[in-house]
Curated annotation (Swiss-Prot):
Database matches in SMART domains: ANK, SOCS_box
Tissue spec. comment: Predominantly expressed in testis, kidney, and liver.
Gene name, Swiss-Prot/TrEMBL: ASB9
Similarity comment text for this entry: Belongs to the ankyrin SOCS box (ASB) family.
The protein, known as: Ankyrin repeat and SOCS box protein 9
GO cellular component assignments: Cul5-RING ubiquitin ligase complex; cytosol; mitochondrion
Role this protein plays: Substrate-recognition component of a cullin-5-RING E3 ubiquitin-protein ligase complex (ECS complex, also named CRL5 complex), which mediates the ubiquitination and subsequent proteasomal degradation of target proteins. The ECS(ASB9) complex catalyzes ubiquitination of creatine kinases CKB and CKMT1A.
Subunit structure, as described in the record: Substrate-recognition component of the ECS(ASB9) complex, composed of ASB9, CUL5, ELOB, ELOC and RNF7/RBX2.
BP-aspect Gene Ontology terms: intracellular signal transduction; positive regulation of protein catabolic process; proteasome-mediated ubiquitin-dependent protein catabolic process; protein ubiquitination
Native source species: Homo sapiens (Human)
Modified residues (Phosphoserine): S51
UniProt site (Essential for binding to CKB): H103, F107
Length: 294
């Protein structure tokens, strides 16, 4: 049963060296302990907080890692187990530990979509900027549609327009995977609506998915319908000519209205993650809602 104490029959409590099937390459009582897999990892990945407490009290290293540099904190975050994350951080777990695949605990929390774990890690100093472009937390959260995680990363200074060569921007990934909530959050927070992947814009990505809703959203935020990708094609040229999306593109191909231009300019003046200040402007409520895309 989870939480069972070793040594209840009077014997010595089970410790790290009582598991001969685990290959330990250094002293497991030290913070740089290495193993193929340990009971600490097992407890963390399954969210067994009582077992985790017992193992720590028996001398197991909080920062024990596998040959691929995976720590118990990585596993707890991947499983979205907030209670285990709290225990590990309380006992000194390395919040910015990096695996052989460049995954950090924060990246794993974004994979699982655990907003609570993301916030706790950020409060304990987790870096929002990735150690490598192979594992970017904000890109992973946007791709999977974890909008609350995206919001927290932005609030802690995450680069909303970080462009990775093989992925593009967070906005591009959200569009490519049709994650509407994340697309809206990124746009509302000031993401560049025309920055995508290479010469592909987010609107090109949306054209391929044939999403009218996302196309409208991007164009409302100023997406360039005339932008050409590496093949010299505009978004409208990526959809069937008679499709509803093609008709929508044709309707929006003309120059934007003065009202739309004013909205885009005012929002740009406020900058990233500052649009909430629009509510403080001395303007009619209807106009504020227009500026906020409400």
């Amino acid at each position: 049963m989870d939480g069972k104490q070793g040594g209840m029959d009077g014997s010595k409590p089970a410790g790290p060296r009582d598991f001969p099937g685990i290959r330990l390459l250094s002293n497991p009582l030290m913070g740089d302990a290495v193993s193929d897999w340990s009971p600490m990892h097992e407890a963390a990945i399954h969210g067994h907080q009582l077992s985790l407490r017992n193992l720590i009290s028996q001398g197991w290293a909080v920062n024990i890692i596998t040959a691929d540099h995976v720590s118990p904190l990585h596993e707890a975050c991947l499983g979205g187990h907030l209670s285990c994350v709290k225990i590990l951080l309380k006992h000194g777990a390395q919040v910015n530990g990096v695996t052989a695949d460049w995954h950090t605990p924060l990246f794993n929390a974004c994979v699982s979509g655990s907003w609570d774990c993301v916030n706790l890690l950020l409060q304990h100093g987790a870096s929002v900027q990735p150690e490598s472009d192979l594992a970017s937390p904000i890109h992973e959260a946007a791709r999977r549609g974890h909008v609350e995680c995206v919001n927290s990363l932005i609030a802690y200074g995450g680069n909303i327009d970080h462009k990775i060569s093989h992925l593009g921007t967070p906005l591009y990934l959200a569009c490519e995977n049709q994650q509407r909530a994340c697309v809206k959050k990124l746009l509302e927070s000031g993401a560049d609506v025309n920055q995508g992947k290479g010469q592909d814009s987010p609107l090109h990505a949306v054209a391929r998915t044939a999403s009218e809703e996302l196309a409208c959203l991007l164009m409302d935020f100023g997406a360039d319908t005339q932008a050409k990708n590496a093949e010299g094609k505009r978004p409208v040229e990526l959809v069937p000519p008679e499709s509803p999306l093609a008709q929508l593109f044709l309707e929006r191909e003309g120059p934007p209205s003065l009202m739309q231009l004013c909205r885009l300019r005012i929002r740009k003046c406020f900058g990233i993650q500052q649009h909430h200040k629009i509510t403080k402007l001395v303007l009619p409520e209807d106009l504020k809602q227009f500026l906020l895309h409400l």
